[in-house]
């Protein structure tokens, strides 16, 4: 039986590339993002893709997406909890409170919503269990200047990962985190345009790393994986 994966933020970047590669090797993939059109393009009419438009800030939308996957394919094996945004850079006393709130809503609460919906399904399905992969960042280790919003959320994701890894053990739910340093995506291209670091790697290298984590049996888990552009000068540039 083909395994199933829900990917949030699946319309572009790492999410889209992971979806394409997963379907190419036999995964059934739920594609979740706000914009339907790019999801339809990625799905391209495939029976192994399910287009699930929605916003990660809406818990009901994610619960509905998980329920739709379970109704069609019987279960959810993996959540790639991927959706996220960059906020405008600045010192803490220059940051617009709306940008802080939006960062927390998408990068932290959105991932909480995804994990909550997936955990509930994995806990009750038969056979029980599954895997949650949270997309962190090198910013989960050390920040780049002016990144108080983004860095704060990514440090919080590390706490989410550790707690889910512990709480999931009785139910065969594994949780790990991938911390990616500058895969070439629209988000990173925008960062470069604003004067950020030019050291990047192909987005496919990040997607292959996600699939390595997803492919493991539930008796094994990559708790934390860091994959980064080789020429990044130091980890603090994540």
Regions flagged by a language model, labelled:
Residues 173, 177-178, 193-235:
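C-terminal helical subdomain
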Residues 25-41:
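Conserved glycine-rich Rossmann-like NAD(P)H-binding loop of the short-chain dehydrogenase/reductase
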Residues 137:
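Residue(s) in the substrate-gating loop at a strand-loop-helix junction
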Residues 53-64, 97:
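The beta1-alpha1 cofactor-binding region of Rossmann-like NAD(H)/NADP(H)-dependent oxidoreductases
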Residues 90-92, 99-101:
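Substrate-binding pocket helix/loop in short-chain dehydrogenase/reductase
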Residues 11-12:
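Conserved glycine-rich cofactor-binding loop
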Residues 115, 153:
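Active-site helix of classical SDR
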């Amino acid at each position: 039986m083909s395994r199933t994966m829900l990917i949030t933020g699946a319309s572009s970047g790492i999410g889209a590339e992971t979806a394409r590669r997963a379907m190419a090797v036999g995964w059934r993939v739920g594609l979740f993002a706000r914009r339907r059109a790019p999801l339809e393009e990625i799905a391209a009419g495939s029976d192994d893709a399910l287009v699930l438009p929605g916003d990660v800030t809406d818990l009901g939308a994610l619960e509905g997406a998980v329920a739709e996957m379970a109704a069609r394919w019987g279960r959810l094996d993996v959540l790639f909890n991927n959706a996220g945004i960059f906020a405008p850079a600045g010192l803490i006393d220059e940051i617009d409170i709306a940008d802080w709130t939006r960062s927390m809503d998408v990068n932290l609460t959105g991932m909480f919503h995804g994990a909550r919906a997936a955990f509930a399904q994995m806990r009750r399905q038969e056979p029980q269990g599954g895997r949650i992969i949270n997309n962190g960042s090198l910013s989960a280790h050390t920040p780049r200047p002016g990144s108080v919003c983004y860095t704060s959320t990514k440090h919080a994701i590390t706490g989410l990962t550790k707690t889910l890894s512990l709480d999931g053990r009785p139910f065969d739910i594994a949780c790990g985190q991938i911390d990616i340093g500058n895969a070439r995506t629209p988000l990173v291209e925008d960062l470069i345009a604003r004067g950020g670091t030019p050291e990047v790697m192909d987005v496919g290298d990040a997607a292959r790393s996600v699939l390595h984590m997803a492919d493991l049996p539930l008796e094994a888990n990559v708790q934390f994986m860091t994959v980064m552009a080789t020429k990044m000068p130091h980890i603090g540039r994540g």
